[in-house]
A protein has these predicted regions:
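C-terminal motif of bacterial Sec signal peptides marking the signal peptidase cleavage site
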Residues: 15-18
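An active-site-proximal structural segment forming one wall of the substrate-binding cleft
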Residues: 45, 82-102, 116-148, 152-189, ...
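N-terminal carbohydrate-binding accessory modules
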Residues: 27-101, 373, 377
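Short, acidic/polar
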Residues: 77-96, 167-169, 292-299, 326-331
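Acidic/histidine-rich helix-loop elements
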Residues: 67-86, 114-120, 159, 273-292, ...
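Substrate-binding cleft of secreted/luminal carbohydrate-active enzymes
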Residues: 289, 293-367
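Catalytic domains of carbohydrate-active enzymes, especially glycoside hydrolases
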Residues: 85-107, 296-303, 336, 340-343
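Active-site region of glycoside hydrolase catalytic domains
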Residues: 165-280, 285-288, 295-317, 339-340
Length: 379
């Protein structure tokens, strides 16, 4: 059956980035009718695992879009940060624009039982699966991760034993849930693993922090692989410390078991003042382009030499009454990714005054030119 719900969308003011917990949806004062689709069948995609290299795989992922501020809310309510419930119609529109990959950020701690079992709620696993199937039914790749669980995933030697135990149990359950699915389902062990609130949080962390993050990735990959079946060879994205691109972060990054099916996951809101802080609304000079190109050259030099495929799991720019500059930045950024075989996945938090380029209430593109530029780069 289909249930029809009336959604009254109010003006909400908040501040959001891909890493914050204060959220908002796209502004509108319309009364919009949204159809809540029936649960998708879980057999819509055959469990095919292709014999394809990670680099070929990432090229086939094309360009991607993040369903931000929904399943990753730091609350039991997925609408707590202002976005509506996710419908198949939303994901259909993302696919119709030409995006081939959906990154599905998921926060698990509000849907997890107590120690020592740390059982994940069945209904929550089913919710994640249902939205994943929205993407899969459109022949899209879908990335499922552990996102805003930083409260308990603290990278210190003191915390490591308990965290590793819980990560092992979480990923065992997630991996078993999706084991029958083919390789269009991708796992991402951790979003931006870091010591939240520490002085070095966004500066590459400490040697201890980087070491422990590597350990957390290790147990996560081991847990996924141990479930067997399709998960024995499934592509897994593994992030650097805080998903950063700094010198110390890249230097200390370790691929668990030198696993050939691990894909590097990084994020870069560059340049910071334009993309994230929103205090410099202009972009596009030769110097701007040279600085961004240099960052991508550093990424390429590191991972090309190691034969690793790379996904840019989050990037974007905030709105500061500067649509032309944002378009120029998006075109240049997405093409830098495409030239290096990197899949660019735009961070969309649902807020048109920040990173939102798609209105999930009206199912319309607020900034279609930006979306088209991202998609066209990887065609």
């Amino acid at each position: 059956m289909k249930n029809t719900i009336l959604v009254f969308v109010l003006l909400i003011v908040a501040i959001i980035t891909g890493c914050s917990s204060s959220e908002a949806s796209i502004e509108t004062n319309e009364k919009v009718e949204i159809t809540e689709d029936e649960v998708m069948p879980n057999n819509i995609i055959q469990g095919v695992m292709r014999d394809i290299s990670p680099k070929e795989f990432v090229l086939d992922m094309g360009s991607g879009w993040n369903l931000g501020n929904t399943l990753d809310t730091e609350d039991v309510d997925v609408t707590a940060w202002g976005n509506p419930l996710t419908t198949k119609a939303m994901i259909d529109e993302i696919a119709n624009m030409g995006f081939k990959t959906l990154r599905l950020p998921v926060t698990w701690q509000y849907h997890t039982g107590s120690a020592p079992e740390y059982l994940l709620e069945t209904d929550w696993l089913n919710t994640v699966e249902n939205i994943a199937n929205f993407a899969l039914s459109n022949d899209m790749y879908v990335i499922i991760n552990i996102h805003h669980d930083d409260e308990w995933i603290v990278p210190t030697y003191e915390n490591a034993p308990l965290v590793k135990d819980r990560l092992t149990k979480a990923w065992t359950q997630i991996a078993n849930k999706f084991k029958p699915y083919g390789d269009y389902v991708i796992f991402e062990t951790l979003n931006e693993p870091r010591h939240e609130g520490s002085p070095e949080e966004w500066e590459g962390g400490t040697a201890e922090g980087r070491d422990v993050v590597n350990q957390y990735h290790q147990v996560s990959v081991d847990a996924i692989r141990a479930t067997g079946g399709n998960n024995a060879v499934r592509k897994i994205m593994v992030s650097t410390y805080a998903a950063g691109t700094g010198e110390n972060v890249l230097q200390d990054y370790i691929v668990p078991n030198n696993d050939e099916d691990v894909i590097v996951s990084i994020h870069s809101y560059s340049p910071y003042l334009f993309s994230l802080a929103g205090t410099d609304p202009t972009w596009g000079t030769d110097e701007d382009k040279a600085q961004l190109t240099q960052e991508f050259n550093t990424i390429q030099n590191k991972f090309e030499s190691e034969g690793r495929a790379v996904v840019m799991g989050e990037w974007g720019s905030t709105f500061s009454d500067n649509e032309n500059d944002r378009l120029a930045h998006a075109e240049y950024y997405a093409n830098l990714c495409a030239e290096r075989g990197i899949c660019p996945i735009w961070w969309d938090n649902g807020n048109a005054d920040e990173f939102g380029i798609f209105n999930r209430n009206t199912l319309e593109w607020v900034y279609p030119e930006i979306a088209e530029a991202i998609v066209n780069a990887t065609k």
